[in-house]
Amino acid sequence: MELTELTGKFKSVLNIEKICDAPPKIMQTITSGANDTLREWVNYFPDLSEDQLQSIFQYYMADRKEKMQDYTSKSLAKACAVTAGISNAKTCYDMCAGSGALTIQAWNINKDCYFICEEYDERVIPFLIFNLALRNTNATVIHGNVLSGERFKAWKLTSSKHFSMIMEISPPKTVSVDVCISNPPYNMKWQHEPFMQLDDRFNLYGLPPESNANYAFILSALVSAKRAVLILPDSVLENGVKSEREIRKAIVKNNKIDSIILNPDNMFESTAISTCLFCLDNNKSDTFVEFIDMSNTYIEETREQKGQIGSKCHTNRIYKKTVKVFSNENVDAMLQAVKNRTDTAEFAKSSSIQDIKSFEFSLNPRKYIEFVYRESKHREYKEILADINKIAIEKNKCKLIINETLAKRLGFDISLYKNENLSDDPLENLIQKITGDKLIKHDYIQFTKNKNEFVFKNNCADSVSTILISIIQMWKQHIMYLNEEENKYLLEMRDALLPDLMSGKIEP
C-alpha cells in the first residue's frame, strides 16, 4: 500500500491527527487490555507476514543522524533469520529490534519461538509491542541500551485467543537464547563505562574502540546466543583500527565465525551502503568459514510513493525507487552453501582458519572465492591503434598557435597540453611493444610568447581540416549576420541624412 494511504489508515485506527502522537497513544491503547484497535488494524491489514508499521516509523520518525536508524528490508530480514537457524530455535533474541522487522520474518518461519526484543529508542518500542501483540506472540520486549548493558523497562507478551496480553515486568539481567538476529546501528560512536573491560562480552576479546560500536554489537550477540547473525556494513570485514583487527583475529582463532555473506548494495530504501551477514556460532562442528558473495545475486523491485510535503505538484507526484532484494531462490542458495560448505567459483568458498591467517585475518569473501578468468573478445591491437592514429591525424590537421597569456585567459590548461607527448608514457611504450607501431604524436596546439598571437593553421597539404571547415562555416555565418546588422544601420543613417541634405540643413 502507498505510504500516504497507509498513514491515513494508521491515524484513523489510533484516532490521532499527527504521527508524533502515535507512541503514547499506542501504549495507552494496548496496555489497557482493549483489543478494538488491534482488531481494527487486522481488518485493514489481514496479512500479518508484512510489517506495515515499519514504513510509517521509518519515514516519519527514524533518527538516521544520531541513532543510525535505517530499517531492514523484508528479504534481507528473512535471509538473516534463515541463516541464523530460526526454524529449529526455541528462543530468539532480536538485538536492536526497531519496529520488529527481523522478528516478524523470524515469526513467519517459526511461530512457536519465544522472542526477546531489545530496543533503545523509546519512541519505536510502542510500534514494536503493537507488532508483536498483533501476531499473538509470546515475547519479552526490553527497553535497554545494548552497548552499556543498562535495562530500563520490560514488558511480557503472552499469547491468548486473538492477541497477546501485555504486562510490564522487571527487565531481565541477562539474555541467553538459541539464536540472535540483529541489524544494529552502523558505525556508531559509543562510550566505555568504568571497568567495562571486565564485562563478559569484552574480557576475552578486548574493548572495541569508542569511535565505532560495530564489534561491540558483535561481541554482545556472541555472549547472548548459541548462534547469531548480524547485518553489518562490510567495513567490519577487514582493516579498521588496531583493537578491531585484534578482536576479529581472536574471533577467527577461537573458531566463532560460521560464515560471512556479502550482500548487494542498495538493499535499503534510505542508503546504498554495502552490507554483509556476519554469522557467529558458539558450537561449530568444523574449523572452516563459509565465504559467500551474494553481491550479484538478487532481483530488483521498484517502490512507488507519493510526495509527502510541499505543493500539489509534489504531493500528487509518484516517486519511484529501485532496490535490490533476495528472491526465495536466492535465500535457499545461500542457506545450502552455508550448510554444505560449498566451493563454487565466483559464489562460495569454504576456508580454513589457516587460510584466513594467510590473508591477515581479513574476512572479505572476495579474497577467498575463486575468480574465473574469461578471455575478453576484442579487435586486433593493430586495428585499434590505427583508429587511434586516424583521430590523431585529424586533430593535427588544424593547429592552433596562441599566445600563452591569452590561452590562460581562455581557460586552456597549458601544462596538460605540454604533458601530452611525454616520451616515457608507459601506455605508449606498451602499445609499441605489442603492435610494433607507434602512437602518432599530437601536434595541434602551440603556445608562444608573441603578444596577442592567435592563429589557426591548416597543417595538411592534401586536405583541409574538418575543424577548420567548421570554423570557416561559423565565421561565414557570423560575418553574414554582422553584414546584415551593418546594412540595417547604414539604411538608418541614409534615412536620417536624406531629409537634412534636401532641406539644406547640412551641406554635402
Feature map (PLM): residue ranges:
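Class I S-adenosyl-L-methionine
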Residues: 1-110
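Alpha-helix N-cap/helix-initiation motif
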Residues: 69, 117, 206-210, 240, ...
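Short coil/turn segments at secondary-structure boundaries
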Residues: 69-73, 347-351, 443-446
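A generic structural signal for residues located within well-ordered alpha-helices
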Residues: 72, 213, 271-273, 485, ...
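Conserved S-adenosyl-L-methionine
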Residues: 74-182, 187-191, 233-235, 246-247, ...
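A conserved structural/catalytic subdomain of Rossmann-like adenosyl-cofactor enzymes
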Residues: 155-158, 174, 181-413, 417
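Amphipathic alpha-helical coiled-coil/heptad-repeat segments
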Residues: 374-508
